[in-house]
Swiss-Prot record:
EC number of this enzyme: 6.2.1.5
Pathway per the UniProt entry: Carbohydrate metabolism; tricarboxylic acid cycle; succinate from succinyl-CoA (ligase route): step 1/1
Role played: Succinyl-CoA synthetase functions in the citric acid cycle (TCA), coupling the hydrolysis of succinyl-CoA to the synthesis of ATP and thus represents the only step of substrate-level phosphorylation in the TCA. The beta subunit provides nucleotide specificity of the enzyme and binds the substrate succinate, while the binding sites for coenzyme A and phosphate are found in the alpha subunit.
Domain ATP-grasp: 32-275
Organism this protein belongs to: Solanum lycopersicum (Tomato)
Protein name, UniProt field: Succinate--CoA ligase [ADP-forming] subunit beta, mitochondrial
One Gene Ontology cellular component annotation held by this UniProt entry: mitochondrion
Keywords recorded for this protein, A-Z: ATP-binding, Ligase, Magnesium, Metal-binding, Mitochondrion, Nucleotide-binding, Transit peptide, Tricarboxylic acid cycle
Family: Belongs to the succinate/malate CoA ligase beta subunit family.
Length: 417
């Protein structure tokens, strides 16, 4: 939704961009610690992984607090309205300090299901204990990379505390968008435009401008792709506070952001996506039944569209790229066959840099290592296509061949029957 609000184009003319495999997403407590290092106001809090740690934190960190906020830590939104598989309702609770241990016991080690986790949910390994702040106003603030303006874009709204989708629908006139010149950086005028648009009720204007500038500094210096604060709150002591934040980082910057990338929690990520990343494959899991292996992101998207056109649903986006090795093809098949939802696999290769014979050899080797229990539909075209077809034919494998993409998609859908 942020991308739609930014009204960004699909590409930046004349600029080559390395394909981004994944974006690092960190937990709320990690984001709060990072923002605090940049002088950004955040609630006092501590992450704990056991009931003993909860008890100690209440005694040491919140000795004079009558109430605290207990937040389950999963890499997904919608925690407050989520449901644990043990029946406990809500992943965020404001409780009496002496009740924190009991509430945490219902969260730690349990699976939380939200609108963003899917039915499988995510395991809560830590909870974040925060001070309960006295808020007088809630707003929305984010910074994203906007391809339309070829730079960072600040999106803000006077209303906050709910999803940006709802805010944009209910309060379109309150949405503020301020593009920032990536070469000049954020100016006092830029930050003032954001603050004046938000029209804080009690927070000091000059202090608020400095907070916006610090948020922008963090965004740039840590190679963020998205920084979202919802709510950006005003407190009764006239401060602007990042009450809840999400930060994503560009994987291409991992080599120079080693400290941040050491925060990656692979246990919260799709294991198939983790395996794909290790093999330098671009994979995104979906909910369909037809596994896809394609070279090139554009062709992969087109393949998924054609599958939908013929009444099927893709199980994934999987781009093996233009220089895939046999080993990567084998790994791709392992990832596809590990998905129990997959009832058929469609391989769609247009060989340019990628050679069809390499793909064919990879398919044959994969069949030897992985028990293929589902139909495999193969469409090959381009470089070394005849050699590739010969390798498949001589392998003795029971493959379904297709002449073109439309034919391949139609056969994949029929194979489900």
């Amino acid at each position: 939704m942020l991308r739609k609000l930014a009204n960004q184009s699909l590409s930046v003319a004349g600029k080559w961009q390395q394909q981004q495999l994944r974006r690092l997403n960190i937990h709320e407590y990690q984001g709060a610690e990072l923002m605090s290092k940049y002088g950004i106001n955040v609630p006092k809090g501590v992450a704990v992984a056991s009931l003993d740690e909860v008890k100690k934190a209440i005694q040491d960190v919140f000795p004079n607090q009558s109430e605290v906020v207990v937040k389950s830590q999963v890499l997904a939104g919608g925690r407050g309205l989520g449901t644990f598989k043990n029946g406990f309702q809500g992943g965020v609770h404001i409780v009496k300090a002496d009740q924190a241990e009991d509430i945490a016991s219902k969260m730690l080690g349990q699976i939380l299901v939200t609108k963003q986790t899917g039915a499988q949910g995510k395991v809560v390994s830590k909870v974040y204990l925060c001070e309960k702040m006295s808020l007088v106003n809630e707003m929305y603030f984010s910074i994203i990379l906007d391809r339309a303006t070829a730079g960072p874009l600040i999106i803000a709204c006077r209303k906050g505390g709910t999803s940006i989708e709802d805010l944009a629908e209910k309060f379109p006139d309150m949405i503020i968008k301020v593009p920032i010149d990536v070469f000049k950086g954020i100016s006092d005028a830029d930050a003032a435009k954001v603050v004046d648009g938000l029209a804080p009720k009690v927070a000091d204007r000059n202090d608020s401008i400095e907070q916006v500038k610090k948020l922008y500094k963090l965004f740039c210096e840590t190679d963020c792709t998205m920084l979202e604060i919802n709510p950006l709150a005003e407190t009764s002591d006239n401060k602007l506070v990042a009450a809840d934040a999400k930060l994503n980082f560009d994987d291409n910057a991992a080599y120079r952001q080693k400290e941040i990338f050491s925060l990656r929690d692979s246990s919260q990520e799709d294991p198939r996506e983790v395996a794909a990343a290790k093999a330098d494959l671009n994979y995104i899991g979906l909910d369909g039944e037809i596994g896809c292996m394609v070279n090139g992101a554009g062709l992969a998207m087109a393949t998924m569209d054609i599958i939908k056109l013929h009444g099927g649903t893709p199980a994934n986006f999987l781009d093996v790229g233009g220089n895939a090795t046999e080993g990567q093809v084998v790994e791709a098949f392992k990832i596809l066959t590990a998905d129990e939802k997959v009832k058929a696999i469609l391989v769609n290769i247009f060989g340019g840099i990628m050679k069809c014979d390499v793909i064919a050899s990879g398919i044959v080797n994969a069949a030897k290592q992985v028990q293929l229990k589902v139909p495999v539909i193969v469409r090959l075209e381009g470089t070394n296509v005849e050699q590739g077809k010969r390798i498949l034919k001589e392998s003795g494998m029971k493959l379904i061949t297709a002449e073109d993409l439309d034919d391949a998609a139609e056969k994949a859908v029929k194979a489900l029957a």
